[in-house]
UniProtKB/Swiss-Prot annotation:
One of its GO terms (biological process) is carbohydrate biosynthetic process. In the N-terminal section; belongs to the formaldehyde-activating enzyme family. In the C-terminal section; belongs to the HPS/KGPDC family. HPS subfamily. It catalyses: 5,6,7,8-tetrahydromethanopterin + formaldehyde = 5,10-methylenetetrahydromethanopterin + H2O; D-ribulose 5-phosphate + formaldehyde = D-arabino-hex-3-ulose 6-phosphate. Its EC number is 4.2.1.147, 4.1.2.43. GO terms for molecular function: 3-dehydro-L-gulonate-6-phosphate decarboxylase activity; carbon-nitrogen lyase activity; hexulose-6-phosphate synthase activity; hydro-lyase activity; orotidine-5'-phosphate decarboxylase activity. Residues 162-396 are annotated as: 3-hexulose-6-phosphate synthase. NCBIfam families: one_C_fae, PRK13307.1. Pathway: Carbohydrate biosynthesis; D-ribose 5-phosphate biosynthesis. This is Bifunctional enzyme Fae/Hps. Residues 1-161 are annotated as: Formaldehyde-activating enzyme.
């Protein structure tokens, strides 16, 4: 048996982060326990957990400092409140029945403990590490989190240290604002006026990228670190190279033209997936998007049904949505459909009713006298609440 648990509790600088393994003495955890006691590392010396001198806790527990111990003050925090907290938490887990008493001699625990170098309050160090150890033990023994929880939470999560989250398109529908004006100061001012929404995508338009190159993505990223940013290159050749350029520029998606050779389309999609970004196929001037898709090795993540600005007086091309989605089901793929060109507030329900997942809007927002109000009207038309808007956040 080898079970793994993790918990973070408290407030800086004394917050506690405990990772632990619990398992049989005769198994891999027991082997790691023995190795830890005999192969010491300067600054990370494992400590046998004792409730007080001459009274080790049961199951036997090894405490491993995560942060390099550089002086006696830090050593005292490990040997003092942290050791006492972990030892007491393990013993209490047995007393409370979390760990079966009859298993106390058969199991061992390895607990990696984080003590911030700026921590000073012994009381907080003890209480936070006690709580984190108990919670990590419970999670390990309960198998928390299960895979369904992981899949549910993975795109909602923002890592506390990183400070921002990488957005993914998993909660359609979305509003995509096309930033086509080739004037960067104007574009950055527009972005600052846009509302913050989980259902807002930013598109670095083709004219903007032609003027400033893909490095314009980093300028947009400075204003909106969390944004999902699409780089509309309308790639026609050198697909893998351009996909890599876009990924290196920190964009989240690259747009390739459906008019490109099939080999180029395949290379864009392959390289996009290698680098962890989305591949978008733009169907501008493509009479039969489904026929193009049927020739691809792997389907793109998004198909954009695009009516050009120069022909916006003509009818929309939303009729292809059903065929695209049917092909995606047949190929066991997930494909989002975006519609662009002439999308207005009064046509939102028509587009969504036809199966659109992303509404691409440009001048109706970017040329508006009140950018925020214009964007808000489209977002309200999506009729989609913010992710976790009504959720009361707990310990994870």
């Amino acid at each position: 048996m080898m079970l793994i648990g993790e918990a973070l509790i408290g407030e800086a600088p004394e917050l506690a982060h405990v990772d632990l393994m619990i398992g049989d003495k005769e198994g891999p955890v027991g082997q790691a326990f023995a190795t830890g006691m005999t192969q010491l590392s300067a600054g990370h010396t494992p400590v046998l957990s004792v409730i007080r001198p001459n009274l080790p806790t049961k199951p036997s527990t090894l405490i491993v400092p995560k942060v390099t111990v550089k002086g006696m003050d830090q050593a005292s925090q490990i040997f003092g409140p942290a050791q006492a907290a972990v030892s007491k938490a393990v013993a209490d887990a047995v007393e409370e029945g979390l760990i079966p008493k009859e298993k106390a001699e058969d199991l061992v625990i390895i607990a990696s403990v984080f003590i911030h170098p700026q921590a000073v309050d012994y009381n907080r160090i003890y209480r936070y590490n006690y709580g984190a150890t108990k919670l990590a033990l419970k999670r390990a023994l309960d198998g928390f989190p299960d895979i369904d929880t992981v899949l549910h939470e993975k795109d909602r999560a923002a890592h506390a240290v990183m400070g921002f989250k990488i957005s993914k398109l998993w909660d359609a529908p979305y509003l995509q604002v096309a930033l086509d004006n080739p004037n960067l100061p104007v574009i950055l001012n527009i972005i600052k006026q846009l509302p913050k929404s989980d259902h807002l995508i930013l598109e670095a338009g083709t004219p903007l990228i032609k003027r400033y190159g893909v490095d314009v993505i980093s300028k947009i990223r400075e204003v909106r670190p969390d944004a999902f940013i699409v780089a509309d290159l309308k790639t026609l050749d050198t697909g893998n190279l351009e996909a890599r350029m876009v990924a290196d520029a920190t964009a989240d998606a690259i747009v390739v033209s459906a008019l490109a050779p099939i080999a180029t389309l395949n290379k864009v999609i392959e390289e996009a997936h290698k680098t962890g970004i989305y591949a978008v196929m733009d169907t501008l001037n493509t009479p039969d998007p489904v026929a193009v898709l049927e020739q691809l090795d792997v389907l793109p993540d998004v198909v954009e049904l695009h009516r050009a600005i120069d022909i916006e007086g003509t009818a929309h091309a939303w009729g292809s949505i059903e065929g695209i989605k049917a092909l995606a089901v047949k190929r066991s793929s997930k494909v989002l459909v975006a519609v662009a060109g002439g999308v207005r507030v009064d046509t939102i329900s028509d587009a969504l009713g036809a199966g659109a997942d992303i509404l691409v809007v440009g001048r109706a927002i970017t040329n508006s006298k009140d950018v925020r109000q214009a964007a808000d009207r489209f977002i309200e038309g999506l009729n989609k609440p913010e992710i976790d808007q009504f959720r009361i956040m707990t310990d994870f």
